[in-house]
Regions:
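Sec-dependent N-terminal signal peptides
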Residues: 3-13
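Outer membrane beta-barrel
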Residues: 56, 60-179
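Surface-exposed beta-loop-beta
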Residues: 178-188
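Transmembrane beta-strand segments of Gram-negative outer membrane beta-barrel proteins
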Residues: 18-37, 60-64
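Solvent-exposed loop/turn segments connecting transmembrane beta-strands
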Residues: 37-43, 140
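Positively charged n-region of N-terminal signal peptides that target proteins for export
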Residues: 1-4, 18
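Short catalytic helix/loop segments, enriched in acidic residues and glycine
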Residues: 42-54
Length: 188
């Protein structure tokens, strides 16, 4: 709760400053997944609220994405989801961008996407996937990792090296989940 209050105060103080532009956007999702054969609810986690916030000052920008997630209580649901709460505030991204003449440098917890083929690219393995959100689109399925990324622009070309000290692994639903698709391999 204390972290939430500190983050809220920082967001409000940066948002209402006179000198630098800030933005806030988000959406609320009120939906559910039900079974076709009986109409019962499928107990999968989902994001009820998404919030994006950013603040720019000269060449520096700080960006963040928060999500309020509902996680059903199922025993041994997943090795990463062992929190006893139903609702969880998830800090999806928080990173700083330094914009330079030749490109930009980003440092922090961020979701990496590479090009237009983000959905199916075999090269796009810098951010892990959360298969509990398999039916979401784009970056909503990805897990952010602490990383340093540089985007350099040369005429019509873009070079983007990235490095991360800790690589996140894909998050798979366990065999106890009510996942509608059978996975070919499940972790022990």
């Amino acid at each position: 709760m204390r972290k939430f209050l500190i983050i809220s105060c920082l967001v409000l103080s940066f948002t209402y400053s006179q000198e630098s532009p800030s933005f806030i956007s988000g959406d609320a999702n009120f939906y559910y997944i039900s079974k076709l054969d009986g109409g019962g609810l499928i107990k999968l986690p989902y994001r009820i609220l998404n919030l994006s916030w950013g603040h720019q000052h000269d060449q520096f920008q700080i960006s963040s994405r928060f999500a309020l997630e509902y996680k059903p209580q199922i025993d041994n649901y997943s090795f990463k989801m062992d929190n006893p709460q139903d609702f969880l505030l998830d800090l999806r991204e928080l990173y700083m961008t330094w914009q330079l003449n030749f490109g930009e440098i980003r440092l922090g917890k961020q979701i990496q996407t590479w090009g237009f083929v983000d959905e199916n690219s075999p090269l796009d393995n810098s951010s892990a996937y959360d298969y509990n959100f398999l039916f979401e689109a784009g970056t909503e399925r990805k897990i952010a990792s602490n990383s340093l990324a540089i985007d350099m622009y040369f005429n019509n070309f873009k070079i983007g090296p990235t490095t991360t000290p800790f690589h996140s692994i894909n998050r798979l639903p366990s065999s106890f989940a009510e996942f509608p698709i059978e996975l070919p391999v499940t972790p022990n």
